[in-house]
């Protein structure tokens, strides 16, 4: 995983389901943002709560009525993040989830992320130092644990 370990024998096996935000949003372009999130759920009983989450992230009802292909890059990223947060999964993988978002959307996304991942393993790959500091999670830098339990304050730009 990310070059942290080089297996020499055995096998790698995941436990449970994994939710992810990739650098490409991988949304269904013909569906609305809400419909894209509902795809990961067994039914639509959570639609009102999903709409509230979108409101917290700054997407209004007009944006939610558009097909995903007409959303801005930042709106697509917020949709992908919400879909991963709502997806049933034991582990969350986030690859540059805040790319293309304005600062207010990043802060709102970080606040929601912190609330929703309590006790859930998260692997976040980002170059966004402000986001790392705001999250305050343990961090790996240059393949070493930089500071357990809190974000690192070093100025080294070689994050992996």
Task: Give the residues covered by each predicted segment.
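Helix-to-loop junction immediately C-terminal to a conserved catalytic motif
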Residues: 2
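Q-loop/switch helix immediately C-terminal to the Walker
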Residues: 24, 30-45, 49
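Conserved ABC ATPase "signature" region
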Residues: 47-63
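Walker B catalytic motif
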Residues: 67, 96-97
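Conserved ABC ATPase signature
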Residues: 67-71, 75
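Hydrophobic anchor residue at the start of the ABC signature
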Residues: 81
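Conserved signature/switch motifs of ABC ATPase nucleotide-binding domains
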Residues: 87-88, 118
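ABC-family nucleotide-binding domains
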Residues: 95, 102
């Amino acid at each position: 995983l990310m070059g942290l370990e080089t297996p020499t024998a055995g096998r790698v096996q995941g436990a449970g389901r994994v939710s992810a935000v990739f650098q490409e949003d991988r949304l269904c372009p013909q569906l609305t943002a809400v419909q894209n999130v509902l795809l990961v759920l067994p039914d639509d009983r959570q639609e009102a709560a999903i709409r509230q989450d979108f409101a917290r992230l700054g997407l209004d009802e007009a944006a939610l009525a558009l097909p995903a292909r007409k959303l801005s890059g930042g709106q697509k990223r917020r949709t992908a993040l919400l879909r991963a947060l709502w997806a049933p999964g034991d582990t969350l993988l986030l690859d540059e989830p805040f790319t293309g978002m304005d600062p207010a959307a990043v802060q709102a996304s970080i606040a929601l992320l912190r609330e929703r991942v309590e006790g859930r393993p998260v692997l976040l790959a980002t170059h966004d130092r402000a986001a790392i500091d705001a999250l305050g999670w343990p961090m790996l830098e240059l393949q070493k644990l930089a500071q357990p339990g809190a974000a690192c304050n070093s100025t080294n730009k070689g994050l992996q």
